[in-house]
């Protein structure tokens, strides 16, 4: 799945270029994706420029709320939202084909518990989501940036952990999954020392595969190649 950029530091002098943990790819949209964008965006789309939102007002109710960073083509988002109509989902993706695909699915399934941003997810977290308002934050199969010189691009960094912690309710959970073991180790290194979190794994490492996480193409691909998948859950405790 596509992932997003680390939280930008506050700028007090001349602007500095923010390191991005995603690359904007020029993907051509199918007719179905374009149709989904045109038909679905007016109902499901939200704009970063609108700033801080009251999501109870956006959804027309108060319900458990999940924020998904980088939903890719939206397959997992659709499956989770359809399986849990009593919950609300905010999905963010930078790549337009994926946004169009998810919107097409939302329109065809007539789901009402999903809203979509098409921009940098951590800018949405920072500017549009109230503190202590999310029950879950999902980060499934982010780009591992394999090369050492690119590790600074990995989304899971101390600043990311703190931003997510602020947006989670006390008791809320950050759920991450990766099919790249070195990235799982990196996630553990960052999160096990991040203030205000508790690792939900009994051994202080990874949790068994959660039943609520849909099987993704990344997971199926990894299984074919003999790779494992590592799930990590960290709960906000203060």
Curated annotation (Swiss-Prot):
Highest rank taxon of the organism: Bacteria
Involved pathway(s): tRNA modification; N(7)-methylguanine-tRNA biosynthesis
Protein name: tRNA (guanine-N(7)-)-methyltransferase
InterPro entries (UniProt xref): SAM-dependent_MTases_sf, tRNA_(Gua-N-7)_MeTrfase_Trmb, tRNA_methyltr_TrmB_bact
HAMAP family: tRNA_methyltr_TrmB
Keywords: Methyltransferase, S-adenosyl-L-methionine, Transferase, tRNA processing
Upper lineage: Bacteria, Pseudomonadati, Pseudomonadota, Gammaproteobacteria, Pseudomonadales
Recorded catalytic activity of this chain's protein: guanosine(46) in tRNA + S-adenosyl-L-methionine = N(7)-methylguanosine(46) in tRNA + S-adenosyl-L-homocysteine
Residues at which S-adenosyl-L-methionine binds: 68, 93, 120, 143
Record function comment: Catalyzes the formation of N(7)-methylguanine at position 46 (m7G46) in tRNA.
Binding site for substrate: 147, 179, 216-219
Gene3D superfamilies assigned to the protein according to its UniProt record, in alphabetical order: Vaccinia Virus protein VP39 (3.40.50.150)
UniProt-recorded Gene Ontology molecular function terms: tRNA (guanine(46)-N7)-methyltransferase activity
Keyword Membrane (UniProt): no
Family: Belongs to the class I-like SAM-binding methyltransferase superfamily. TrmB family.
GO annotation, cellular component aspect: tRNA methyltransferase complex
Active site per the UniProt annotation: 143
CDD domains hit by this protein: AdoMet_MTases
EC number, as in UniProt: 2.1.1.33
